[in-house]
């Protein structure tokens, strides 16, 4: 399953991405993708992005060549034109996937978009442009029985770009905070328009009216909540208390029970087609 973790900045997206990656790595092989500006997931996993790290934003030409797209042409042509597209695989690793993946441990590999890299400064591309390869890589990635966790950019902007059309589920992290709830609702509405399954995880729970309101209003899509745990603050997975471990089991069980495999490439093709229609209006 390919799962993108989204939400308001500071809601706990990167921490949730780390928790799920570590939890799932106990049973599956996991591909963790850091698609955020801050590159916190990479840091939490103990990886340092350097000048020579092969990130998505540094392999544009190579990716375009692999998918048969001439340089300096619209990326949407990848899915809008009749062409034979490659399939990328996580296990076994295809050549391209292997070239941009870094082994964190025997069960977790990491890919990084690179939005926080120093060479982004003065770049002619915006964050959308730098994320282009990932956008078209995701629906072409065959994960098999493995799991893919993507730590997304804060807010709803990347949904407007269609970055997550290639995922099986969007999981919004929401905390009992008015702005966090506002962004969560924006994400929910956009996901519905894009026909991407959307679920929620309550983070930093505390008893107040907003907490109760969120639990009631979104009870049909909430997978569970992550309790306060000192080990989470210290990024000590082995030190998680029993309540946190049980919460992660419940969240994963809920997500699995709702999972329906769909053609994500067709979803991206539909998105780009509608986008092209809007552009000529």
Where are these regions (language model features)?
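C-terminal boundary of histidine-terminating zinc-finger modules
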Residues: 236-248
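Conserved catalytic-core segment of NTP-binding enzymes
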Residues: 19, 26-27, 126-234
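Cytosolic-facing regulatory segments adjacent to core modules
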Residues: 86-105, 111-148
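N-terminal phosphate/diphosphate-binding loop that engages ATP/GTP or pyrophosphate donors
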Residues: 23-106
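Hydrophobic anchor at the beta1->P-loop junction of P-loop NTPases
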Residues: 5
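P-loop (Walker A) phosphate-binding loop of NTP-binding proteins
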Residues: 8
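Hydrophobic positions on the alpha1 helix immediately C-terminal to the Walker A/P-loop
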Residues: 16
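Conserved lysine of the Walker
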Residues: 13
